[in-house]
Amino acid sequence: MRLPLILILLAALVPVFFGKTRSAPFWLAVQAVALAWNGAVQHDAGGLHALAAMLEVLVVRALVAPLLLRRAIRQRGEPNLDLMPSNLFTWAIGISLVVLAFDFGGAAMQDVPALALGVVGGLVALSLLLLSTNNAAPAQLVAVLFMENAIAVFESLLPEPWAWPVHAALTLVYLGTVVVGCWLIGTPQPRAPAPALPAQGEAS
C-alpha cells in the first residue's frame, strides 16, 4: 500500500520546508504512526511478532520520543525558529535532493518497493540537508531521528521481520539516542561571563 509511504515523506517535507522547531515532535509522531501502518501492511498484521513491532513503534517512536523531545525543547528555551532556514537556495537544494533520491530509487507509484526506496532516499537527503543548514541542537537531533525513521522504512522491505533479539537491540539503540540527545538539549547552556567593568579610578 502506497499511502503510508507517502504520509511518511510528507511528514518530513512539511516540517523541513514550512515548520518550526517546536512543531518537530508532532511530525515525528505522524511519521511513527505512518511507520506502524506501513509495517502492518508489509507484514502479516495478525502475527505476534508484527503486532509487537507495531506496538513498539507506536509507544516508543510515536509517544515517548516526541514527548521527550518536546520537553527538552521547552527546557532549552530558545526562540521558535524555522527548522530549516527559509530561502530559495536551500529550498532549491532540498527539492533537487528529493527528486534525485526518487530517481535513484527508481520510485514508481505502481511499484511499492521502489517507492519505499525513494522515500528512504528522500528522508536521508532531507536529514543531511537539515544537518548542514541548521546547527541548533534540537534541529540536529530531529535530523538524526528522521534518518532513524528512514532506516525503519528500509527495514520494512525485508521479507521477514528481524529476530526478537535484534529487534530489541535496535529499539534500545533508538531509545538511547533519544534519551541522550534530549538530555543534551535540555541541559542549560553555560553563559559567558560578563566583561568586567573598569574601576572608577581607572575610568577617570
Language-model regions, residue ranges each:
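Alpha-helical transmembrane segments of multi-pass membrane proteins predominantly involved
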Residues: 1-204
